[in-house]
């Protein structure tokens, strides 16, 4: 669920998804095209690819079980879809944390019109 993903992002990065990631680069937020702009944007690209493999799941709204303890995100038991969505979100949130040192404020509200060219394949 998007709100759960936001909590994971906040836990890992200490930043709220909105405004820091919702419109970042070419892939953070809805959709995406072109080449990822940097490591943070690549985290979002990989997250989009992860969700893309779950076409039969309601990736944005399915509620899953997870815990935030001792500095770690742990996905809990649930349906196959819930567990897979949680893993996509967990991996992305951890990726965003690893990319904090190269986060660029200039990509925070990056216009889609500047995301041109062919998209990479997943």
Swiss-Prot record:
The record marks 61 as: Binds D-95 of CBa2, important for stability (T-70). One of its GO terms (biological process) is arachidonate secretion. Keywords: Blood coagulation cascade inhibiting toxin, Calcium, Disulfide bond, Hemostasis impairing toxin, Hydrolase, Ion channel impairing toxin, Metal-binding, Pharmaceutical, Secreted, Toxin. The record marks 30 as: Binds D-105 of CBa2, important for stability (T-31). It is an enzyme of class 3 (hydrolase). Pfam families: Phospholip_A2_1. It catalyses: a 1,2-diacyl-sn-glycero-3-phosphocholine + H2O = a 1-acyl-sn-glycero-3-phosphocholine + a fatty acid + H(+). Its cofactor is Ca(2+). The record marks 16, 18 as: Binds G-45 of CBa2. Coiled coil: none annotated. SMART domains: PA2c. The record marks 31 as: Binds E-93 of CBa2. The record marks 2-3, 7, 10, 17-18, 22-23, 60, 103 as: Putative interfacial binding surface (IBS). Its EC number is 3.1.1.4. Binds 1 Ca(2+) ion. It is found in: Secreted. The record marks 1 as: Important for stability and high toxicity. The active site is at residues 47, 89. GO terms for cellular component: extracellular region. PANTHER family: PHOSPHOLIPASE A2 FAMILY MEMBER, PHOSPHOLIPASE A2, MEMBRANE ASSOCIATED. Belongs to the phospholipase A2 family. Group II subfamily. D49 sub-subfamily. Heterodimer CA-CB: Crotoxin is a potent presynaptic neurotoxin that possesses phospholipase A2 (PLA2) activity and exerts a lethal action by blocking neuromuscular transmission. It consists of a non-covalent association of a basic and weakly toxic PLA2 subunit (CBa2, CBb, CBc, or CBd), with a small acidic, non-enzymatic and non-toxic subunit (CA1, CA2, CA3 or CA4). The complex acts by binding to a specific 48-kDa protein (R48) receptor located on presynaptic membranes, forming a transient ternary complex CA-CB-R48, followed by dissociation of the CA-CB complex and release of the CA subunit. Monomer CBb: The basic subunit of crotoxin is a snake venom phospholipase A2 (PLA2) that exhibits weak neurotoxicity (10-fold less than the heterodimer) and strong anticoagulant effects by binding to factor Xa (F10) and inhibiting the prothrombinase activity. In addition, it shows the same effects described for the heterodimer and binds the nucleotide-binding domain (NBD1) of CFTR chloride channels and increases the channel current. PLA2 catalyzes the calcium-dependent hydrolysis of the 2-acyl groups in 3-sn-phosphoglycerides. This is Phospholipase A2 crotoxin basic subunit CBb. The lineage of its organism: Eukaryota, Metazoa, Chordata, Craniata, Vertebrata.
